[in-house]
UniProtKB/Swiss-Prot annotation:
<keyword id="KW-0134">Cell wall</keyword>
<comment type="function">
    <text>Aerial growth, conidiation, and dispersal of filamentous fungi in the environment rely upon a capability of their secreting small amphipathic proteins called hydrophobins (HPBs) with low sequence identity. Class I can self-assemble into an outermost layer of rodlet bundles on aerial cell surfaces, conferring cellular hydrophobicity that supports fungal growth, development and dispersal; whereas Class II form highly ordered films at water-air interfaces through intermolecular interactions but contribute nothing to the rodlet structure.</text>
</comment>
<feature type="signal peptide">
    <location>
        <begin position="1"/>
        <end position="20"/>
    </location>
</feature>
<dbReference type="GO" id="GO:0005576">
    <property type="term" value="C:extracellular region"/>
</dbReference>
<keyword id="KW-1015">Disulfide bond</keyword>
<keyword id="KW-0732">Signal</keyword>
<feature type="disulfide bond">
    <location>
        <begin position="42"/>
        <end position="77"/>
    </location>
</feature>
<feature type="disulfide bond">
    <location>
        <begin position="34"/>
        <end position="97"/>
    </location>
</feature>
<keyword id="KW-0964">Secreted</keyword>
<feature type="glycosylation site" description="N-linked (GlcNAc...) asparagine">
    <location>
        <position position="115"/>
    </location>
</feature>
<keyword id="KW-0325">Glycoprotein</keyword>
<dbReference type="InterPro" id="IPR001338">
    <property type="entry name" value="Hydrophobin"/>
</dbReference>
<feature type="disulfide bond">
    <location>
        <begin position="98"/>
        <end position="111"/>
    </location>
</feature>
<feature type="disulfide bond">
    <location>
        <begin position="41"/>
        <end position="91"/>
    </location>
</feature>
<dbReference type="GO" id="GO:0009277">
    <property type="term" value="C:fungal-type cell wall"/>
</dbReference>
<feature type="glycosylation site" description="N-linked (GlcNAc...) asparagine">
    <location>
        <position position="54"/>
    </location>
</feature>
<comment type="similarity">
    <text>Belongs to the fungal hydrophobin family.</text>
</comment>
Amino acid sequence: MFARLSTALLAFTLATAVVAAPGGRPSEVEYEQCNGGEIQCCNSYQKADSLDYNTSKLLGLLNIDVKQITAGVGLTCTGINAVGIGGGSSCTQQKVCCTNNKFNGVVALGCSPINVSL
Protein backbone atom coordinates (compact mmCIF):
# COMPACT_ATOMS: atom_id res chain seq x y z
CA MET A 1 0.00 0.00 0.00
CA PHE A 2 2.81 2.42 0.92
CA ALA A 3 4.62 1.68 -2.37
CA ARG A 4 1.49 2.54 -4.38
CA LEU A 5 1.03 5.78 -2.48
CA SER A 6 4.68 6.72 -2.99
CA THR A 7 4.47 5.94 -6.70
CA ALA A 8 1.29 7.98 -7.09
CA LEU A 9 2.81 10.91 -5.22
CA LEU A 10 5.96 10.78 -7.36
CA ALA A 11 3.90 10.68 -10.58
CA PHE A 12 1.80 13.64 -9.42
CA THR A 13 4.92 15.65 -8.51
CA LEU A 14 6.55 15.00 -11.88
CA ALA A 15 3.36 15.86 -13.77
CA THR A 16 3.03 19.10 -11.84
CA ALA A 17 6.64 20.05 -12.60
CA VAL A 18 6.13 19.45 -16.32
CA VAL A 19 2.96 21.55 -16.40
CA ALA A 20 4.61 24.40 -14.47
CA ALA A 21 7.79 24.47 -16.59
CA PRO A 22 8.16 27.55 -18.82
CA GLY A 23 7.79 27.19 -22.56
CA GLY A 24 10.61 27.46 -25.06
CA ARG A 25 9.53 30.74 -26.66
CA PRO A 26 8.30 34.09 -25.46
CA SER A 27 4.55 34.29 -25.86
CA GLU A 28 2.76 36.54 -28.30
CA VAL A 29 1.57 38.54 -25.30
CA GLU A 30 5.21 39.39 -24.53
CA TYR A 31 5.85 40.51 -28.11
CA GLU A 32 2.74 42.69 -28.06
CA GLN A 33 4.12 44.37 -24.93
CA CYS A 34 7.46 45.06 -26.60
CA ASN A 35 6.70 47.22 -29.62
CA GLY A 36 9.86 48.78 -31.01
CA GLY A 37 12.22 47.18 -28.50
CA GLU A 38 13.86 43.89 -27.64
CA ILE A 39 12.85 41.44 -24.95
CA GLN A 40 15.68 41.22 -22.43
CA CYS A 41 16.27 39.13 -19.34
CA CYS A 42 17.97 41.36 -16.76
CA ASN A 43 19.44 40.46 -13.38
CA SER A 44 17.92 43.67 -12.05
CA TYR A 45 15.59 46.42 -13.19
CA GLN A 46 15.26 49.90 -11.71
CA LYS A 47 12.81 52.66 -12.42
CA ALA A 48 14.34 55.88 -13.73
CA ASP A 49 13.15 57.89 -10.75
CA SER A 50 14.63 55.51 -8.17
CA LEU A 51 18.10 54.53 -9.40
CA ASP A 52 20.41 53.38 -6.64
CA TYR A 53 23.84 54.91 -6.04
CA ASN A 54 25.84 52.14 -7.77
CA THR A 55 23.66 52.23 -10.87
CA SER A 56 23.96 56.01 -11.09
CA LYS A 57 27.76 55.75 -10.81
CA LEU A 58 27.90 53.04 -13.50
CA LEU A 59 25.79 55.16 -15.85
CA GLY A 60 28.11 58.10 -15.19
CA LEU A 61 31.15 55.98 -16.10
CA LEU A 62 29.42 55.16 -19.39
CA ASN A 63 28.84 58.90 -20.01
CA ILE A 64 25.08 58.53 -19.65
CA ASP A 65 23.38 61.56 -18.16
CA VAL A 66 21.20 60.17 -15.36
CA LYS A 67 18.98 63.26 -15.51
CA GLN A 68 18.01 62.42 -19.10
CA ILE A 69 16.77 58.91 -18.30
CA THR A 70 12.99 58.73 -18.33
CA ALA A 71 12.38 54.98 -18.69
CA GLY A 72 13.68 52.08 -16.64
CA VAL A 73 17.21 50.69 -16.60
CA GLY A 74 18.08 47.01 -16.89
CA LEU A 75 21.39 45.69 -15.56
CA THR A 76 23.27 42.61 -16.72
CA CYS A 77 20.84 41.75 -19.52
CA THR A 78 20.75 39.07 -22.18
CA GLY A 79 18.46 38.92 -25.16
CA ILE A 80 15.56 36.52 -25.39
CA ASN A 81 14.59 35.44 -28.88
CA ALA A 82 11.68 33.55 -30.38
CA VAL A 83 13.71 30.74 -31.89
CA GLY A 84 15.41 29.74 -28.67
CA ILE A 85 18.99 30.10 -29.92
CA GLY A 86 21.53 32.74 -29.09
CA GLY A 87 20.77 34.47 -25.82
CA GLY A 88 18.30 31.83 -24.75
CA SER A 89 14.56 31.81 -24.44
CA SER A 90 13.89 31.45 -20.73
CA CYS A 91 14.38 34.00 -17.99
CA THR A 92 14.59 33.42 -14.25
CA GLN A 93 15.05 37.11 -13.40
CA GLN A 94 13.19 40.19 -14.73
CA LYS A 95 11.83 40.23 -18.29
CA VAL A 96 11.87 43.73 -19.73
CA CYS A 97 11.38 45.41 -23.08
CA CYS A 98 14.30 47.74 -23.84
CA THR A 99 14.79 50.18 -26.70
CA ASN A 100 18.52 50.85 -26.16
CA ASN A 101 20.92 48.01 -25.42
CA LYS A 102 24.15 49.43 -26.85
CA PHE A 103 26.31 48.42 -23.91
CA ASN A 104 26.53 44.64 -24.54
CA GLY A 105 23.98 43.85 -21.84
CA VAL A 106 25.83 45.58 -19.01
CA VAL A 107 23.19 48.31 -19.09
CA ALA A 108 19.99 48.46 -21.12
CA LEU A 109 18.08 51.74 -21.32
CA GLY A 110 14.50 52.58 -22.17
CA CYS A 111 13.23 49.48 -20.40
CA SER A 112 9.78 48.62 -19.13
CA PRO A 113 8.84 45.41 -17.33
CA ILE A 114 6.89 42.78 -19.23
CA ASN A 115 3.82 41.59 -17.39
CA VAL A 116 3.43 37.91 -18.28
CA SER A 117 0.57 37.27 -15.88
CA LEU A 118 -2.13 38.69 -18.17
